[in-house]
Amino acid sequence: MPYGLYFSIAGLGIFVAAALWPPQRPRVLANITYILGMVINEIPHYGALLLAIWLGISIVSGDFGTPADITVAVALTALVAAGLFALGWRARTSRAIVAAALRDAGIEPARSSNGHATRRGWQITLFPFAVRPRSVVRERNVSYGPHRKQQLDVYYRKDRPTGGPTLLYLHGGGYFLGSKHHEARGLLYRFADRGWVCVSANYRLRPRAGFLDHMVDAKRALAWLHEHAGDYGGDGRRVVMSGSSAGAHMSSISALSQQDPRYQPGFESADTSVSAVVGLYGYYGPYYGDDWNAALPSSPLVMDASSAPPFFLTHGTVDNNASVENSRELAAKLRAEAPTRPVYAELPGAQHGFDLVSSWRFEAILDGIEDFTDAVLPVSVNRR
């Protein structure tokens, strides 16, 4: 009896179940299922490949002693394969959903069904990891303030084209952890390769830092980008602010508090304007310990959005780290108050952290972000 095969398939089944049905509570169980299901949720085809390899090895090795052994193996394999198929199907719907969200905001999705998307789809199916193109340079650990955590990495093309917009990315991690090195690599690489100047910044974290410290860091990074984008060929007048989870929280507040001196004490006159926002699986409620009526608002949901720049928001329906309700509420607020209708793409089956690998889902989102920025921030890049 091939017990090793049975245990392997059952183990994979646990990962698949965690991705399909992650609980919201209790918190400990939610965190465990998030960790177990995060990767397989984005690249289920690799799970299917493992199933095929394990089954093939058992057949070649003659591990099946009786027909009952074969029946059990086939039943387990079919059950887990069905779960993997469901994960893949949910991920593949993302492109149509992003396209519909763009159309809802009055933007025609140029990249949703063209040959470029198909070619890239094959590439990420075979190799689902973001690799920095040879055309893109990364300049590491540039200081944007006096604190040791106030450092950023700059991504730009080797040939330094001029006139491209700029992008500031802030990582997630609940304000407790995370760094500029891990999330949204595909976003930074793709836009840098297009001729943008892209920046990924660290910021001070809890428990040594509080809400105003985080916002000061976000604003200082913005001010640095406005001042220094031209050093790398970028146009500092056009800045897209983006982030994942906590980074999306900071980005949204920064966009709704442009030039507000309360959020940038000590450098009140610095340019911290934002041209557009991209929020990935963001938390948009109040900061730890704050209430909705805090003197210094820590939630975009209670801030004035009448002058808000264009927003692109996306969130997964099974996110058990930051509720999708937050994004729904922010999208509704922007529709009611903002000058431009937001793009809001709600992705079936997407979990927190979907930007950690290059997947079908994240590729569809990146195509949507390109369409969004092309519409609200026309790109004019001069190649040298």
Describe each model-derived feature in a short phrase.
Residues 163-174:
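Short beta-strand element of the alpha/beta-hydrolase
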Residues 181-199:
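Short amphipathic alpha-helix adjacent to the substrate-entry channel of hydrolases
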Residues 285-286, 318-322:
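Acidic catalytic loop of the alpha/beta-hydrolase fold
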Residues 2-31, 37-52, 324, 328, ...:
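C-terminal catalytic histidine-bearing segment of alpha/beta-hydrolase fold enzymes
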Residues 15, 22, 32-60, 64-65, ...:
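N-terminal cap/lid segment of alpha/beta-hydrolase-fold proteins
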Residues 300, 309, 323-333:
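Short alpha-helix in the alpha/beta-hydrolase fold that links the catalytic acid
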Residues 307, 313-315, 319:
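Short beta-strand/loop motif that positions the catalytic acidic residue
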Residues 220-292:
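Primarily recognizes the serine-hydrolase "nucleophile elbow" in alpha/beta-hydrolase
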